[in-house]
């Protein structure tokens, strides 16, 4: 089977396994991204996310993750919800409404790799879903999935940015897609203007240690310091402000993945309900949820902070 048939098969299987986009880029060292990442880390924009400092060489070179790698296959999976969270409740980022996307998408990637091996033969490859040293957005751009917006998110033309990004790095030669050369954000600055913590800097740079998502998910301290004393607008887990205001997301449409449907009662949980919840109940109710990343203590800390600010 030649590279043209490899490519056709990969894209057909991607649709069969529930992905909304599949693009392929040549596996190579990301020299420009390496410089940007180095500068971002040097400025301390990653805050306490010290894991970002590790495995630098792996992040910029897929051939060090999969020996003999020739192609990086990017997949997108829509998570735009049909049901919006009602106002008046602690806000949860849309990506966390349902089951943990890591588990859902990793299963699909493994099944896809199995199918490729059955149809082509032995393949050296690995799947990645936002939990390994892979620069997913860079590969998504290189594979023609979209462009990087001012808010740092990948934006698909006429579809928006509510997508999970996943990758397969394989030793197959394929026909490679071309990146979208134009930046369709133009002069729009809605995401920059709307960010209440001024976390979006020029040149598509995110100062993560000012971001609401960072403070509500990644920060492990028991107390949110006064240095971060800004308007959190009722966010208890993550933040969607810079995506919600993006004009391109008016083209988004509801996902078709049953596992991403909101966990029952999640979107209408009150502050009191969260604060009164016990650990056993939390683990049982959200055992397959991204909310486990913050742990119950983290979510309670966030809600107590909101209350202290009169929210």
Language model feature labels by segment:
Residues 1-184, 233-234:
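Auxiliary alpha/beta "docking" domains used to position bulky ligands
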Residues 224-311:
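Alpha-helical scaffold domains
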Residues 187:
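SIR2/sirtuin NAD+-dependent deacylase catalytic core
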Residues 16, 29, 190-214, 219-220, ...:
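Iron-sulfur cluster-binding cysteine motifs and their immediate structural context
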């Amino acid at each position: 089977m030649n590279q043209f048939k490899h490519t056709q098969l990969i894209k057909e299987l991607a649709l069969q396994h529930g992905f909304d986009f599949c693009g392929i880029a040549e596996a190579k060292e990301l020299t420009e991204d390496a410089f940007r990442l180095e500068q971002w880390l040097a400025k301390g924009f990653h805050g306490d996310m010290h894991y970002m400092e590790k495995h630098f060489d792996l992040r910029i070179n897929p051939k060090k993750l999969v020996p003999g790698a020739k192609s990086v296959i990017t997949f997108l999976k829509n998570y735009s919800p049909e049901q919006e969270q009602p106002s008046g409740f602690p806000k949860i980022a849309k990506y966390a409404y349902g089951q943990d996307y890591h588990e859902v998408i990793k299963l699909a990637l493994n099944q896809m790799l199995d199918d490729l091996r059955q149809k082509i033969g032995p393949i050296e490859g690995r799947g990645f879903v936002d939990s390994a040293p892979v620069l997913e957005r860079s590969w998504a751009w290189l594979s023609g999935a979209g462009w990087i917006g001012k808010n740092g998110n990948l934006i698909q033309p006429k579809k928006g940015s509510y997508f999970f990004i996943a990758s397969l790095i394989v030793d197959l030669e394929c026909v490679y897609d071309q990146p979208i050369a134009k930046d369709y954000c133009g002069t729009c600055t809605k995401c920059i203007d709307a960010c209440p913590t001024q976390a979006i800097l020029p040149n598509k740079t995110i100062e993560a240690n000012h971001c609401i998502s960072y403070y509500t998910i990644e920060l492990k301290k028991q107390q949110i310091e006064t240095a971060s004393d800004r308007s959190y607008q009722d966010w208890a887990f993550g933040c969607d402000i810079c995506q919600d205001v993006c004009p391109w997301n008016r083209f988004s449409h509801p996902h078709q993945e049953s596992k991403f449907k909101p966990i029952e009662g999640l979107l209408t949980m009150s502050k009191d309900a969260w604060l009164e919840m016990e650990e056993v109940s939390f683990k049982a109710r959200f055992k397959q949820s991204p909310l486990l990343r913050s742990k119950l203590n983290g979510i309670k800390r966030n809600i107590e902070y909101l209350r202290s600010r009169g929210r």
